[in-house]
Amino acid sequence: MEGQQKFNQLLNEINVYKQQGDLIQQQIELVRASIAEVDALTNTLDDLEGKDSVEAFVPVGAGSFIKGELKNTDEVIVSIGSGIAVKKDVDGARETIARQKKDLEDSLDKMLANMQQVSDIIGSLSAQAEQLAAVAQGNMSATGLN
């Protein structure tokens, strides 16, 4: 019965690591979405560069928009985290956004490395479980219980 207990323990560990991998994958997707938002913001700033005013649709809630005009496109209110936003010129905003993107990419790299570690552990545990199952199957065949 010791082999069965070890097998069950391995299966439990595999399930725990799979759940951990699922959580890491969700975090990876959130960070990738944030990077895409930062890229979209950078593109918007590039599109607005040198223009005094721009027509735009302004969100007013519930998926509704009003046509409006963006004036003074040389200043941007940029979120710096913790619910704090500051006014910056376009170049200052680009610098802040570039730092935010680098931080996000660094976080993504760490998450991907963690995901690889979890995947490697799952692979190792699965190999151990398969080995135990094969031994148990061999023992059952040898005793005629199969």
UniProtKB/Swiss-Prot annotation:
GO terms for molecular function: unfolded protein binding. GO terms for biological process: protein folding. Gene3D superfamilies: 1.10.287.370. Keywords: Chaperone, Cytoplasm. Transmembrane segments: none annotated. It comes from the Archaea. Pfam families: Prefoldin. GO terms for cellular component: cytoplasm; prefoldin complex. Its main location: cytoplasm. Signal peptide: none annotated. It is found in: Cytoplasm. PANTHER family: PREFOLDIN SUBUNIT 5. HAMAP family: PfdA. Heterohexamer of two alpha and four beta subunits. Belongs to the prefoldin alpha subunit family. Molecular chaperone capable of stabilizing a range of proteins. Seems to fulfill an ATP-independent, HSP70-like function in archaeal de novo protein folding. This is Prefoldin subunit alpha. The gene is pfdA.
